[in-house]
Amino acid sequence: MDPYKVIIRPVVTEKAISLIEKENKLTFIVDRRATKQDIKRAVEEIFNVKVEKVNTLITPRGEKKAYVKLKPEYSASEVAARLGLF
């Protein structure tokens, strides 16, 4: 699956910003057909970072949300700044 089709948009909520600052996690809405491996590959390729783990859930609205934890040597704040979240 094309990395640019896997990630639909970042989530910008109070909880998502808190996760960026406290747990080094990014939150994205992703394609519902994307697997955790697809999401990991897409984030690593697009943002040039290494991913530690990916957790996913289907929201009540029917969207797939992915919580992506980056390895400690990479900063979620820097990626968020590149995305324009800060």
From Swiss-Prot:
One of its GO terms (biological process) is translation. InterPro entries: Nucleotide-bd_a/b_plait_sf (IPR012677), Ribosomal_uL23 (IPR019985), Ribosomal_uL23-like (IPR013025), Ribosomal_uL23/eL15/eS24_sf (IPR012678), Ribosomal_uL23_CS (IPR001014). SUPFAM superfamilies: Ribosomal proteins S24e, L23 and L15e. GO terms for molecular function: rRNA binding; structural constituent of ribosome. Keywords: Ribonucleoprotein, Ribosomal protein, RNA-binding, rRNA-binding. The keyword Signal does not apply. One of its GO terms (cellular component) is ribosome. It comes from the Archaea. Binds to 23S rRNA. One of the proteins that surrounds the polypeptide exit tunnel on the outside of the ribosome. Belongs to the universal ribosomal protein uL23 family. Part of the 50S ribosomal subunit. Contacts protein L29. HAMAP family: Ribosomal_uL23_A (MF_01369_A), Ribosomal_uL23_B (MF_01369_B). This is Large ribosomal subunit protein uL23. The gene is rpl23.
